[in-house]
Amino acid sequence: MLRKRQVHLDFHTSEYVPVGDNFSKEQFQACLKAGHVDSVTVFSKCHHGWSYHPTKVNEIHPQLKFDLLGAQLEACKEIGVKAPVYISAGYDEKEYLKRPEWRWCFSPDKKAMEEYEKEVHFHTLCFNTGYLDFLCAQIEEVMVKYNPCGIFLDIIAPRVCYCEKCVSDMKALGLDIENEADRESFGQMVFNKYLEATNNAVRKHSDTATIFHNSGHIPKGDYRYIDANTHLELESLPTGGWGYDHFPLSAAYVRTIKDAEFLGMTGKFHHSWGEFGGYKHPNALIYETALSIANGAGCSIGDQMHPLSDLNKATYNLIGKAYSLVEEKEPWLFGAVNVADIAVLSAESTTGDRSVKADVGANRMLLENHMLYNFVDENADFSQYKLLVLPDVSAYSTEAINKIKEYAENGGKIIATGDALINEGKFFIDFGAEYKGKNEFEPTYFKPCFETVNGNTEYVMRCSFNKFEATEGEIFATEQNPYFNRTLEHFCSHMHAPNNPQEEFQGAVINGNIAYIGWDIFTAYATHGHLCFKELFTYAVKKLLGNEQTVIAEMPDRGVVTYTRQQKENRNILHLLFAHTTVRGTNTEVIEDTVPLYNVKCSVRCDKRPSKITLVPENTSLEFEFVDDRAEFIVPKVDIHRMVEIAYEN
């Protein structure tokens, strides 16, 4: 079982600075204790290419005079802290400079490669060269010498490469280097070879060591990669470019994978990795770790040890402020499974394209609406969910289309948007509507047939629209076109032409258990964020789910609501989170002051009357009413994170 309070201790250290001079086992242990840390990832080899222990395979850091890795492992063992070992896989700057034939060549353009080689950063090596054997030898050396509890391999991904070896091997296989599909296929073959070789290097010496290959993102639907790991670590530093909504999206997918244990990896830095002297406010770290545990994950906090190798006391006092709270909450975390009403069939998993924005927009709408949801791929059992969302894109396999049809035929509720229900030029589910093709106008306008914040007027929709004609059901939105598309020949004002009110078409329909929205609202929401996109989706959800929604909590849009089940303890845990973020500097979203919420009204659908409802870990009872299969209660205060236990008699 993964531990919940981990630190990822980066140690990428130049050969031009002293290393290890200040290391003290006692100081190292004292800081880990102050941080309430129960697992720390320590370094065998860094991105610079140096080892931090005696080695016959690689080269020890030229300024290191003792076995630093061995000393760290011993220190951790004495205090019961686990210590997986880190080995940089994709980067090895020392070998990149020494071995040109091992270099990853991202382009056949020699000038582009020369410019890349001069850039001041780490450079990538190719796994289709002798470097892979070199890497595996390093892994085996660590396994034999230290028998660690786990191996963490970093900077890995399928890559197209134009190095001499890759070009030669592609030709030998009859693949065309000029063909993009062939290049990507060969890149995946090389990546698969890397996964197999490195895993074998671990498994030759241990059946129990954990293995994780880090690429900074968990690719949805890619089981060749997912299954190569014993667990998953979701690298997601909100201030490091990932943002505060990346982790909930990634977690909502990963927690659906059978038997998958996972961590949410944030950092103590103000910005991101490698920032010596950068600290976020304790409230930010408290929120980020609470977000991890509320989404079913353990926690991992990134730090970077000073080259002199003494841990920074301020850092571990900061970490301790967050992890002391996580430690108190652990009895309500182990074995907890997230409950979800809604499944989103991930656009990334369907298309294989990480850059599609539909998942991002859907995640934001669901998060802001405080709905219980998961992201799933085509392998999921849709029948577990009350509502299936099909966002914007249509690239489903025949098997997936049949599963969606079966789900609908059995009464499953569906909301589909944009192209999601279209296959071979028509809707693949009969919901009383006929597909009429892609609208030639963009943007278009949406006019609601229901109450909205700004009333019954025309709202611009900066996205594509599919025309359709429904003969059954409730039309809950209509569509209007602009007078014309903006071109050099004709344009109007600064942005786009106004709506033409003389013509109005069907825009969204609900018929029975199926809702269809003609616009790509999720992609548009991720890009533009118009409130009307969310209002359109929210109306459809509430119309279809009604009183079946498991949790309703009156929270601001930045609030987060999750709900978990501990079967063994016969209880559910309601997680309520709220933090106010603000932008500091250039696009750095930070959390500083807490803004408590008071008297938060909650309504939870229950199979039977709870025996008690309690604030935990404080063990403060809450009064509640049980009406129409719903427990109604008020949470007096939410200050960053609040957990509510809903318990039942056995």
Stretch-by-stretch model annotation:
Residues 1-15, 110-122, 257-273:
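N-terminal small/glycine-rich loop or linker at the start of catalytic domains
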Residues 1-49, 79-81:
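N-terminal structural segment of carbohydrate-active enzymes
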Residues 2-3, 31, 39, 66, ...:
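Carbohydrate-binding surfaces of carbohydrate-active enzymes
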Residues 10-12, 41-48, 87-94, 152-162, ...:
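Short, solvent-exposed turn/loop segments enriched in Gly/Ser/Thr/Pro and often Arg
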Residues 11-23, 121-134, 274-282:
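Active-site mouth loops of central-metabolism enzymes
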Residues 18-20, 52, 88, 94-98, ...:
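Short, solvent-exposed loop/turn and secondary-structure capping segments
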Residues 28, 33-68, 91-118, 146, ...:
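Aromatic-lined carbohydrate-binding/catalytic grooves of carbohydrate-active enzymes
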Residues 85-146, 179-184, 195-197:
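Active-site-adjacent "subsite" loops/lids of carbohydrate-active enzymes
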